[in-house]
């Protein structure tokens, strides 16, 4: 049970990092689209 919680916490942290990276990737694209 504790092992499952540990895996869930790690996956949550990984997903949060992935979302942050996606935001950093999408920001310049959206800004360039707005300026066009």
Swiss-Prot record:
Primary localisation category: mitochondrion
Cell compartment(s), UniProt: Mitochondrion
Keywords: Mitochondrion
GO CC entries: mitochondrion
Keyword flag Mitochondrion: yes
Name the UniProt record assigns to this protein: Uncharacterized protein YML007C-A, mitochondrial
Lineage, highest ranks first: Eukaryota, Fungi, Dikarya, Ascomycota, Saccharomycotina
């Amino acid at each position: 049970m504790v092992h499952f919680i540990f895996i869930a916490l790690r996956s949550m942290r990984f997903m949060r990092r992935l979302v942050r990276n996606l935001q950093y990737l999408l920001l310049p694209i959206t800004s360039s689209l707005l300026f066009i």
